[in-house]
């Protein structure tokens, strides 16, 4: 019976094998539909990728908070319940990160690549796609914010609109054994969970000198943009941009010292000791791999020249002899003016057989890309079967994001990460924030249950 169905169903093409494309392709194959993944790497590299593996994490190695009463954690939990391969694999390759889901990015991407490569319904074509397929082909556009120029040009012609853009950056990574733990210390903020972070404390004099070095360091030249009109994503600002915004901006952002204490300083419960010893600012490093040999500087996205990165970052206490595995880089991210173009099903309004997913739609963050891939892949499979596409409830974090990108005001559409402000108000006002977020979570997961009957598994039952 399955062979008969496959003979009359339309195959699906997924353009791009990032987080969204990987998830979309898996959901199509999971439904019993043949799917072709077109990925330009390694034939053509992007400015930010370092390998040809699928779902390469080019910025942080963290998917955000694990707890489901946090926006990113709720989105992860929704994807787990909907059978996301990408989140399931992240759980399997997690590294210690306090209350966050962080992964060994090399093993993680390799595992996802292998899973798709070995699936009998998946065909992988390593080539650059330079134009959109015809409207007779069911296609998921998941080429991400680094879509190659020929395809981007064809997409502009198809939509009749110029794409939007912002500039994104990745943090440096250092060898763990080059960090001086006589100066730095292991701890998680407020001692939550295990001591999963390495913390480099600064006094006021060190902090001010470090900020001055950031302000005067030479930056790498970015191509194809007006330096006076550079647009950054507020959730991923370069550290030098934070330094420019004010003397204390970094201390209230990635360098905030609150909740971090080195036991060598004395008794944290002694008020006098705490006042005398507490750090003025703290740089945190998060484990990058399973073995704890590589560590990334949290919140240290940067566009400084590589030599300048080494000079300035080695001013951080504990990193004077740091050996850099990777320096930070910046790149231009392209996204669609989705509210003018997409339905909540992630189909293009002008071509129902073409769907979009991931960062190119204007969602921000790894978990959001996975959610878009899940929905686009599920709907591509349904279209291949001749079934109506679905959208996700706006009360779920995944649904709130897709409704935002398809329905937001378009005067100045900008990328949006998962956040509770996207969800409809609760019937009753709850003043306590944690209790309110818990109520949002409970409603979201309850409403998600009705969608589970429509996922690809049900299509082949």
Curated annotation (Swiss-Prot):
GO terms for molecular function: flavin adenine dinucleotide binding; tRNA (uracil(54)-C5)-methyltransferase activity, 5,10-methylenetetrahydrofolate-dependent. GO terms for biological process: tRNA methylation; tRNA wobble uridine modification. Keywords: Cytoplasm, FAD, Flavoprotein, Methyltransferase, NAD, NADP, Transferase, tRNA processing. It catalyses: uridine(54) in tRNA + (6R)-5,10-methylene-5,6,7,8-tetrahydrofolate + NADH + H(+) = 5-methyluridine(54) in tRNA + (6S)-5,6,7,8-tetrahydrofolate + NAD(+); uridine(54) in tRNA + (6R)-5,10-methylene-5,6,7,8-tetrahydrofolate + NADPH + H(+) = 5-methyluridine(54) in tRNA + (6S)-5,6,7,8-tetrahydrofolate + NADP(+). Its cofactor is FAD. One of its GO terms (cellular component) is cytosol. It is found in: Cytoplasm. The keyword NADP applies. The keyword Methyltransferase applies. Its EC number is 2.1.1.74. InterPro entries: FAD/NAD-bd_sf, MnmG-rel, MnmG_N, TrmFO. Belongs to the MnmG family. TrmFO subfamily. PANTHER family: GLUCOSE INHIBITED DIVISION PROTEIN A, METHYLENETETRAHYDROFOLATE--TRNA-(URACIL-5-)-METHYLTRANSFERASE TRMFO. This is Methylenetetrahydrofolate--tRNA-(uracil-5-)-methyltransferase TrmFO. The gene is trmFO.
